[in-house]
Amino acid sequence: MKALFRFKSCLFDPTRRRNQLVSFSGFSKSSKSNKTRETTTTSKIQAEATAITSLFNEITEILGTDVVKLDETTRLRSHVSGAVSDNGVSVSCTEGVRQNAAMGFSGEDEKAQKVLHEEVDFSPVVHEITSVVRGDDVLVSMEDRLEKLSFRFEPEIVENVLKRCFKVPHLAMRFFNWVKQKDGFSHRVGIYNTMLSIAGEARNLDMVDELVSEMEKNGCDKDIRTWTILISVYGKAKKIGKGLLVFEKMRKSGFELDATAYNIMIRSLCIAGRGDLALEFYKEMMEKGITFGLRTYKMLLDCIAKSEKVDVVQSIADDMVRICEISEHDAFGYLLKSFCVSGKIKEALELIRELKNKEMCLDAKYFEILVKGLCRANRMVDALEIVDIMKRRKLDDSNVYGIIISGYLRQNDVSKALEQFEVIKKSGRPPRVSTYTEIMQHLFKLKQFEKGCNLFNEMIENGIEPDSVAITAVVAGHLGQNRVAEAWKVFSSMEEKGIKPTWKSYSIFVKELCRSSRYDEIIKIFNQMHASKIVIRDDIFSWVISSMEKNGEKEKIHLIKEIQKRSNSYCDELNGSGKAEFSQEEELVDDYNCPQLVQQSALPPALSAVDKMDVQEICRVLSSSRDWERTQEALEKSTVQFTPELVVEVLRHAKIQGNAVLRFFSWVGKRNGYKHNSEAYNMSIKVAGCGKDFKQMRSLFYEMRRQGCLITQDTWAIMIMQYGRTGLTNIAIRTFKEMKDMGLIPSSSTFKCLITVLCEKKGRNVEEATRTFREMIRSGFVPDRELVQDYLGCLCEVGNTKDAKSCLDSLGKIGFPVTVAYSIYIRALCRIGKLEEALSELASFEGERSLLDQYTYGSIVHGLLQRGDLQKALDKVNSMKEIGTKPGVHVYTSLIVYFFKEKQLEKVLETCQKMEGESCEPSVVTYTAMICGYMSLGKVEEAWNAFRNMEERGTSPDFKTYSKFINCLCQACKSEDALKLLSEMLDKGIAPSTINFRTVFYGLNREGKHDLARIALQKKSALVAQRTVS
């Protein structure tokens, strides 16, 4: 059984197991004590630092004495990201995807479509239908208005309307549900591909699953684009297990796995940090002779460079030379950059030494990469030494000095940055605009407004043309000094210089005005944006409206909402045939979630992504000691530049260490030039609530209000959720009312948080949940599937099935899919043992019965097995197989639970083999059921095998898995193993509950292991102290 749930390398050729690149056995943890581990780690770090210093001295000696020849042909250059054809012409991966998309129809269909598009212009019809779908009419429903239209809803029209609804998935789904009920509707693969892309962009994986089931039921065959969209959607959601399953199903469906499918899969794995799996796919590609472009190679290099597999990384660089037809010089330049970005300075220096041994010419670009890597690693002295070598060789320029300046600014050392700035100017080289901008931003943050303005004037006097980022930085500086007129003057100078303000420039302007409550000026900006045909995003409107509500500007909110309506109307016109908006859907496959999408020209440095290395460094400091004075001393010595974005990420990653991170939050808030924003306060409130430190949570809320930070519905939703999840639902209700008393209108997320906690067993309040749910419906919000499932499940559990049934009609009227609503209701009935009532509801359903059967048959099977009717359950499974619906993971899990309960281990193994045969990926619930099942049979070793194998297959154990395994181990007198699981939970950032500690404590005492029981109590006390401040 141990091998039964091991990761399926059957995805690949079995003969390749001998020379696998990666091993999946590295998940088990060492049982050494923390003290030994810290000593070993410290010694290792010291030894590595000594080795790097020695190596660096050797490299500087080599570089300092070598004579460099300037060869323009060997400089790093950008290449077209694509595979190389037989004749040497580079082929874009994007082009390949679009070719795949064209394969969705047969050749005859393609010709018919072409003729149809040539003869008929559908755009006026599409525009009119879209205006109805996206229109705002509270009196007449969308469906009623669509019925009055006299158009034929041809597949091309439907597809283009859906493309225009790309950013409003709930409206797209309502239109889709309506139009497919029309007579003569054609279930075309293009329409489903569009809907899958919309659902994927909205991160609604339930909708994706429903659409796939619907395609299968209606006999709509998937084309190659369908498969690539599904792989992309699951990859973007970091559901790697599902992505792998789709990839395998694509293989079994008879489609040839081309470069596009592999490309998306490898990118997904790289983004998820699963370099080991990416290497497996890469090796399979190489064996099949399939290649991809330079861009994916760079992603693979960056991902693998973070590991210790230096030889593998270098072999990939060799493949880049062979396949992408780039020079060794360029390939090793990319390799050097990957090492530097990953913080592998030692490996980077060793690579430089190897290149010199090969007598490869090192140009200025290599030096720049090395300087940037040293600056990122906070080795400024070493970076300056490399710059000095460049200067002696006359390779230094304003670009490399700009890198040094950025390094000092990251350390908040403005004085040294200015010294280097003077060095650039004295050398006679003009500094870059980005260097000016970065220094100005830091001066404005340090309240040195005059110096920042003087620098801007100096830049203009020296003939250096500022870009939109530089001008926006000066505008923000003026607004920080409440100089609105001057800010407008500088902002207007953009157009005078021929620079068109970007939406980012406008959004920064708006947010700065919000902080000083200049709402008349904001209305002026919105009107200007509308006149300039610049789309105003909904999050900007929400920000402004929330700020106005907080300050009691209710009259002006009406004006803002009118502008928002005009802006939405303009968006519809802008989309035209849907291409402008739907181009983002294409990027889901073509440029899916690529890290290089953010461009510095469009994004000010201060707003760029947080450096992960900085986050890791601060988290390491916070976890290194429980003595706050020592931690504070280490933070003071840190060279990291603290920004609100960085603070948010630190709080998110280290939230289990509530005491340390909240002290850090307080400490960083008192630093000169730093101020918390709303997002930072929201995250700190969440951290305090997760640690049940409600006194500190409220204290942070009041501090947030005193500091003038914008308190939105999200802030209240966080507090409501934190109170509710611990059973303090009365306080959660009072907090919700307190929010409304302050004039804030509840948002969809606020309603969801309150209803969810009111429906939970701990602190359940059904009456208040019903009242709040009805208020949410009256407010015009459509609940998501998860909320409906919680609410209907709660009503059925307390026996209030009448209200649950009446709720179905209300949901149907507001656009919630009726079939989905009934499937949730039937599921709830099955879970409380009312199987006959569930079957009665299923039989009397007047809608699309076959679709409801697909949605509910797993619940029916579960209910039958709970009652002990195995034969009827198997008959149900077989009947669904006959109509083409295979059992899902839910059905298989129910069968496994039943067979374990009946002690039929052979049947369990048989069911597992069927799952593997049908490529049905086990879920975390399946693994948990197997662990508990083996423990119930006294097979402890097999339970541990199942637990470890789930990690090897990429499924991480969650809190419930750990809790149930701990309970089973303690019942089996294996409490010492359960104690190890507590430690593993803490290592993974999962906080054990009080019940977990109590179970282990009692188990150890029953077994006579009193010393270990005291250790369990000490762990609990340490965790409480670690998570709370009050």
UniProtKB/Swiss-Prot annotation:
Residues 1-77 form a transit peptide. PPR repeats lie at residues 188-222, 223-257, 258-292, 293-323, 328-362, 363-393, 397-431, 432-466, 467-501, 502-536, 677-711, 712-746, 747-783, 784-814, 818-852, 853-887, 888-922, 923-957, 958-992. Keywords: Mitochondrion, Repeat, Transit peptide. Pfam families: PPR, PPR_2, PPR_3. It is found in: Mitochondrion. The keyword Repeat applies. GO terms for cellular component: mitochondrion. Belongs to the PPR family. P subfamily. This is Putative pentatricopeptide repeat-containing protein At5g06400, mitochondrial.
